[in-house]
């Protein structure tokens, strides 16, 4: 073999070795996708300054806490925070995010924001209420001629996106959804110190007919959801039961959603894959926290 042939062979081996090293990383990154929404500064929306709106919370802190942890686990990140997290932007982002999902992907969706009971108009809820996420530009109350709830994202609408994603990633993939909101909370209470309580959500339902909200008492900690042979399995973590309030907690001088805090704490050592055992650990940690004695997380899964 001549010198040139030896050089070509050496080059081929080097290129092959390099590809063997970097290709798994490309596949790993492409196979793990995360989309996060975190809203803190609801009061900064000047377009809603003339109405009684939502109190500020600390949803952006949750996103800032989780993103580095997810990146370390190989996830590509898409996020919307504060004024970026309008209803239109969330919808467009969920659509574009779902279009990127591929067979076998592990998908993580996270929502840290207010939540609100929303009057059910299609009759699919036995108690007459849907649950809705509250984007940055959603009003708290119905206003004739101005706002009819179009910026709320109901659980029915969210489920449409989830079904699309589950179909795209297929049975070889998996979908996680973390909802650190609340649909039965009251309002902000106290000053920001160790003894204060920041509550997400409201106990006032959104209703065009002025219907009074009465929460359904469901004490199940684990709920079975739809399963299909052509869909990815799904696991949904919710911060509390439908009749409870979702309290933020303070750690190292910062406020976080309690569910987000313990999801991050758990994922610092647990692998985020198709094994959902880590979600049970999150539930255990929250139940052990004396600050959350009146709050019980809920796990919904197709497994």
Where are these regions (language model features)?
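Cysteine endopeptidase catalytic domains of the caspase/legumain-like
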Residues: 2, 26-303
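Bacterial N-terminal signal peptides
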Residues: 14-24
């Amino acid at each position: 073999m001549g010198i040139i042939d030896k050089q070509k062979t050496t080059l081929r081996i080097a290129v092959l070795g390099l590809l063997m090293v970097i290709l798994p990383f490309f596949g790993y990154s492409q196979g793990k996708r995360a989309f996060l929404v975190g809203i803190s500064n609801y009061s900064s929306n000047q377009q809603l300054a003339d109405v009684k709106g939502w109190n500020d919370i600390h949803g952006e802190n949750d996103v800032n806490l989780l993103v580095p942890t997810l990146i370390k686990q190989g996830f590509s990140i898409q996020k919307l925070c504060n004024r970026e997290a309008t209803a239109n932007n969330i919808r467009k982002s969920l659509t574009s995010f779902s279009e990127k999902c591929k067979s076998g992907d592990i998908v993580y969706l996270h929502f840290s924001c207010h939540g609100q009971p929303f009057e059910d108009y299609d009759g699919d809820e036995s108690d007459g209420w849907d649950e809705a996420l509250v984007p940055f530009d959603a009003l708290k109350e119905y206003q004739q001629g101005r706002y009819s709830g179009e910026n709320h994202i109901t659980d029915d609408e969210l489920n449409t996106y989830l079904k699309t994603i589950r179909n795209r990633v297929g049975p070889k993939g998996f979908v996680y959804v973390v909802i650190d909101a609340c649909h039965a909370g009251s309002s902000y209470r106290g000053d920001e110190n160790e003894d204060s309580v920041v509550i997400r959500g409201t106990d006032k339902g959104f209703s065009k007919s002025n219907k009074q909200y009465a929460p359904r008492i469901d004490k199940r900690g684990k709920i079975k959801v739809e399963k299909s042979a052509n869909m990815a399995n799904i696991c949904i973590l919710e911060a509390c039961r439908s009749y409870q309030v979702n309290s933020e907690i303070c750690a190292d001088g910062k406020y976080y959603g309690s569910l987000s805090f313990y999801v991050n704490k758990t994922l610092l050592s647990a692998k985020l894959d198709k094994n959902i055992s880590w979600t049970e650990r999150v539930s255990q940690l929250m139940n052990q926290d004396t600050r959350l004695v009146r709050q019980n997380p809920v796990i919904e899964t197709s497994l």
